[in-house]
Amino acid sequence: MGHELTKNDIKKMEEEIEYRIHEVRKAALDDVKETRAQGDLSENFEYHAAKRFKNKNESRIRYLQRTIKNATVIDDSSADDEVGVNNTVEVLYEDDESTETIKIVTTIRADSLSGMISIESPLGKALLGHKKGDRVLVQVNPQVEYYVVIKSISNTDDSDAVSYTHLRAHETELHL
């Protein structure tokens, strides 16, 4: 089974595929041709770096295509009063009385250091469908579990997400 993705996640991945096929691929091939013409390939670092970059780009295209092909499309809308995808949630950790504001996102957008928690993570799974004030059991594994209380829920969207094209654009600039 593949990732659970929203329609917008897939749209952004398709944008990156198009960008990589029509922009990056052409530039990478030109770079390989140009560095190949510099002579002895056995000692031509630029040629080998250009080939590696071209192969990395092709690998990324295949990865994105495979991810989309195997994805399960999920709805990113939820009721105003319950936790769903793209909601910002403030939780209270009962064990130490600390609070944290997190955003529930699809796995492909998850970044726990930035407070973007995957719907497939123990915390994300536990919170989905719950309401403000609910005390929720989070099971990390059979030996580790803890409780959180939902303090607030904000219905947001994924407009804070950076386009996949822009996330990868710096790769191209570094190698061309």
Regions found by a protein language model. Name each.
Residues 75-148, 154:
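Non-DNA-binding regulatory cores of transcription-related proteins
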Residues 2-59:
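N-terminal cationic and glycine-rich segments that engage phosphates or anionic surfaces
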Residues 165-172:
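Conserved small/polar residues in nucleotide/adenosyl-binding loops
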Residues 48-77, 81:
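Internal alpha/beta loop-helix hairpins
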Residues 20, 31, 38, 64-71, ...:
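Conserved, well-folded catalytic cores of nucleic-acid-processing
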